[in-house]
Amino acid sequence: ISVTNNPEHIAELNEIKARYALELKSREDNTKRKITALRDKIQSNYEIWTHFITLTFKENVVDLKLAKERLKDWTKKMKLIFPEFQYIYVVEFHEKGGTHFHVICSMDPGKMVSNKKFNEVRRTWNWGTNTSGIDIKGINYKYVPKSKDSDKGELALKKADEKIKTIWSVGNYLTSYLKKDANATFLFGSKMYGSSTGLKKSIEITDPKKIANLEREL
């Protein structure tokens, strides 16, 4: 008897296809909710964010549990330098299956981090190479090139709307990894992002000028 002509087999096959389609839709919807929630949390706390950090491993770490343990150890070291240290991280998988972390964080908000503390931060990540492993980019300040009135360039504090745009871009950048590695989340059965406690969950922007500036960036 041909399987393709057997009504029972056809019905069973259609049921399997329907369940699979439903599972894919559920995973897609779940990923969208996670992306929205994470982006909201990043944007809601825009005032405290000062730096964007990427942490990479010297070896190809495929054990996500081990990678997260090392990340946790790193956050403890950061809290020793910055007692009010706050963060949100996202995991990204390399093509070979290894992991690294993208972190938006708060170091001494409202202040410029001293060279001494900056060097201490560089020594907090022990699992990279001697010359790399931790890449740090500032969020609060922008580089102003030298002009007629200045012989050299300098760092200037960003205006509120400039920082909001920066945080918006960083939020989109971070959440893009959740979308890219959605299947990896399903396979490993582990959250691909996390944060410190005490962060705001959502915020509503009502200032027409800020809304207009943000809309122009979309």
Residue spans for each PLM region:
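Right-hand nucleic-acid polymerase module
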Residues: 1-99, 108-218
